[in-house]
Amino acid sequence: MIKQIISIIFITLWTIFSTYGFITPFLIINQEKMFVETLKKSFQVLTSFVLKYGFGINLKCNMNITQTKNKVDILIANHIATIDSFILLSMLEHMNISNFIMIGKKDLIYTPGVGLIFMFGDHIKLARNWEEDKNTIDKQLENIKEGIIVLFPEGTRYTEEKFKEGQEFSRKNNLPVYDNLLVPKSKGFQAIYNNLKNKNKLGNLYDSTIILENKNLIDLFKKDSTNVHLINRILNKEELENKDFKSWLLEKWSEKDNLIKTYSKIKYENMYLELDENFLFLNLFIYYNVFILLIENKEFRYYFLTLIVIAYIITYLKRNQFVKKS
């Protein structure tokens, strides 16, 4: 448990230190894509490192995902736990894919470190109001030319209470009753799919089934290691030509439900951690020298603390502007 707690503290300090201390001033002055992409990649590498060595999570995957050149791919997944997003980002990092686009509540921009990645990137920020969100999706997709959109059609993570409510809802409405999954929602997913398809920007449609041996986050603190199985597959887009989108999605979720029941029969490969040495070296080099300077140089200490305070103030003002615009 001590190792896991240290890992959480480490990743929290890293995100605050790296974003507010160094990258924020550059983003405020000029929101160059280079800084955003560097931050995303660096965060991916750190996420993979912490999941593996902090929480002892072993990723096992049945197939790789490839990014389609000059197209926008969509990756859908079940939402089983708090760390699902980090698991998928780590999986994509193992596959050397850093051009990811996340979908989430706009309130995420207030999360230190991760909030900056979500705010300045091309990520789709939702207000949970469909009329507003539909416009946001269409507007944001105009800026996305290439990459992989990662989304959870269930809209919320798995809990026993939500699971039982979903089963009851399905029975009342004559829908498939799942044994391991929540009921997926099709509206947002369909809007993204149709937008990309109509503009000839749609690449591959991927599905990832996440299977955790320990669903409860508390269980991760109690064990030294745990396995996460990822069953990836390419979905046939042509099926949607003659099917209702909602019915098609429910059908795919039934297939996912069966995959979870039989996941032990599938052949997996361990995803070994191959960290990008350039990013690791850059981070370690910067942090080591900064901490040395903080200890040895009083003037720099004051400068650095002032920089962080200014970055927080400017970022807060920028966030208010962002919220008003969106």
Which sequence ranges carry the predicted segments?
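Alpha-helical bilayer-embedded segments of polytopic membrane proteins, i.e.
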Residues: M1-G21, M271-N320
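Membrane-anchoring hydrophobic helices of lipid-metabolizing enzymes
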Residues: M1-I74, F86-I87
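Soluble catalytic domains of membrane acyltransferases
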Residues: G54-L217
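Membrane-helix interfacial anchor on the cytosolic side
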Residues: F55-L59, I313-S326
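Short proline/glycine-enriched turn/loop segments at secondary-structure junctions
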Residues: L217-K223
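A glycine-rich helix N-cap at a beta->alpha junction
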Residues: H229-L235
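Short helix-loop capping/hinge motifs at secondary-structure junctions, enriched
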Residues: K237-E241
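Juxtamembrane amphipathic/hinge helix adjacent to a transmembrane helix
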Residues: K243-I286
